[in-house]
Amino acid sequence: MPTTATVDPLALDRQVCFALVTTARRVVSVYGPVLEPLGLTHPQYLVMLALWEHSPRRLRDLAEALSLEPATLSPLLKRLEAAGLIERRRDPDDDRALAVSLTAAGVALRERALAVPGQIMERLGIGIPEVERARDALNAILAATQEPAR
């Protein structure tokens, strides 16, 4: 047992993994009530963000952009398609590939979604500079996990 003069490297509150998991869980829960009026869950919102950046997209490319397996992405797409926000079709350039594109309703939803980031920051009680610093720190951790082990 460590003394009060030493710092326990195994203390739960010192673990980056614990901070990431608990923060992610809580931040995602803040999105729920903000996204509900749009008819979206947080995972569906992420899909829509990726498609608002670039549509149409091949399923494989969309899954990669979201860091998801295509099998995990497929049920999300099915629900978005049932809601009339996207459509899935065979890629005209490659019959084996599936292309995902926004419908007119999906494009129109973007206008309403523009308010989401501001509402989230308001609910979190932090400003743009803090959010940008946190995002940059998280992206640095993400990049470090993608580098070869030293």
Which sequence ranges carry the predicted segments?
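Amphipathic alpha-helical linker/stalk segments
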Residues: R123-G125, T145-R150
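Conserved amphipathic alpha-helical interaction elements at protein-protein interfaces in regulatory
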Residues: P33, P37, E53, R79, ...
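Short secondary-structure capping/turn micro-motifs that flank functional sites
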Residues: D8-P9, L51-W52, R96-A97
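N-terminal leader segment of winged-helix/HTH proteins
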Residues: M1-L38, E132-R133, A140-T145
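Charged, amphipathic alpha-helical coiled-coil/dimerization segments
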Residues: V28, P56, K78-D136
